[in-house]
Amino acid sequence: VPPRDAAERVTFATWAIVTGKSPGGIFNLLPKLDEDTAAKMAQRLSERAEGPITAEDVLTSENIQALADKVRQYLEAGTIDGFVRTLRARPEDDPTKVPVFVFHPAGGSTVVYEPLLNRLPADTPMYGFERVEGTIEERAAQYVPKLIEMQGDGPYILAGWSLGGVLAYACAIGLKRLGKDVAWVGLIDAVRAGEEVPQTKEEIRKRWDRYARFAEKTFQVTIPEIPYEQLEELDDEGQIRFVLEAVKQSGVQIPAGIIEHQRTSYLDNRAIDTAEIQPYDGHVTLYMADRYHDDAIMFEPRYAVRKPDGGWGEYVSDLEVVPIGGEHIQAIDEPIIAKVGAHMTQALNEIMHRRTSEVGK
């Protein structure tokens, strides 16, 4: 089973880098490390999580799931004010410095943008907008006033991976409607399904059949028979709570963080599938991977099909598609994020140059 959230991805990748061998899967029994390697692993995990992971933590974890559970508490900590996470603060001596605003991916937090931040100019401020409930439009309606409070009339640099890209796009529309200066919008593999996702009762049944197979593989549990009639009476929130409660009742020990990740992942992906995309009169950059990962396609087969414009061409007046290769799940980490960072740095430098020229005039 591959990593399921940011903590498991960081832990999995760190194990592979330090030992030179893939752990295989998150449930695979980890080989015993010597003390030097365990210390090196602990140091690297501590740097990524920004919290104290010890060699003892590494040596006593039987698999990646167990080690990631220790990493998660630190990785998801940090400075948060309401729903805004400070990834790098704007320098006090330069309040005019234009920050990058990033938006959380489906089922995750904005800590996933650390590798991107490390690929941008060293003094680039970055603020992450964390999860609020509701449709895409309802979430953007909460984010836009906060963006204006932080950045006034602009310019605005907005970016996001996965759902984060859809949220960045919705906020760009909200800001433009209020006459604000949106300088740049970047979608990191926020690629729409290549075919329409039907919203019918029959589709609800098919979706939950697929989810049951996905959950059995991901959690290593047996899902009891799904009571479709009961599910059909519930909204998306009620449906996922119902199914996850059944998973919990199975008696298998699953970290609370993973259960919450599954709940928010499901709701966030449903928000994408049911969003009504509005036209945008401006420039948007889409960093496009080759494909979605197998789990995403297993859950919604229509994501196996990708349009050359990622499904955005009919809405965006000036769309730039930048191919980055790889799978969706890899797009936010090294080495692929280096391509995004290099292109984005160029775009940021051009914006700063234009701004300096205008101020000079």
Regions found by a protein language model. Name each.
Residues 26-29, 156:
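A short, structure-level motif marking secondary-structure boundaries and short turns
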Residues 1-5, 31, 133-137:
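Short acidic-aromatic active-site loops that bind/stabilize oxyanions
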Residues 36, 40, 44, 65-72, ...:
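A hydrolase-biased, glycine/serine/histidine/acidic-enriched motif that marks catalytic-domain neighborhoods
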Residues 19-27, 34-62:
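Phosphopantetheinylated carrier protein domains
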Residues 3, 30-31, 105, 160:
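A generic structural signal for short
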Residues 1-23, 37-44, 145, 286:
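Thiotemplate assembly-line natural product biosynthesis machinery
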Residues 1-4, 63-68:
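Flexible lysine-rich "adenylation lid" loop at the C-terminal edge of ANL adenylation domains
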